[in-house]
């Protein structure tokens, strides 16, 4: 069975987790912001709908 040679230090582990959590928080904030702008109608984002895709074919 594969086993790591040495234990990863707590500080290295915490740094990695902090990086992952920060990236996840940034993406969540972007998604929330986009959702809010779509709901308020202030966005220039065009959400693709199935009807538009059928017309192109």
UniProtKB/Swiss-Prot annotation:
For the region Disordered, give the residue spans. Answer: 1-23
What GO cellular-component annotations does this UniProt entry give?
large ribosomal subunit
Ranges in coiled-coil conformation: none
- Please give the SUPFAM superfamilies that the UniProt record associates with this protein: Zn-binding ribosomal proteins
Superkingdom assignment: Bacteria
Tell me which UniProt keywords the record has, alphabetically: Ribonucleoprotein, Ribosomal protein
Please name the InterPro entries in this protein's record. Ribosomal_bL32 (IPR002677), Ribosomal_bL32_plant/cyanobact (IPR044958), Ribosomal_zn-bd (IPR011332)
A GO biological process of this protein is: translation
Show the GO MF annotations.
structural constituent of ribosome
Q: Which family does it belong to?
A: Belongs to the bacterial ribosomal protein bL32 family.
User: PANTHER family annotated for this entry?
Assistant: 50S RIBOSOMAL PROTEIN L32, CHLOROPLASTIC (PTHR36083), LARGE RIBOSOMAL SUBUNIT PROTEIN BL32C (PTHR36083:SF1)
What HAMAP family does the annotation carry? Answer: Ribosomal_bL32
Name of this chain's protein: Large ribosomal subunit protein bL32
Organism (species): Nostoc sp. (strain PCC 7120 / SAG 25.82 / UTEX 2576)
The opening ranks of the lineage are: Bacteria, Bacillati, Cyanobacteriota, Cyanophyceae, Nostocales
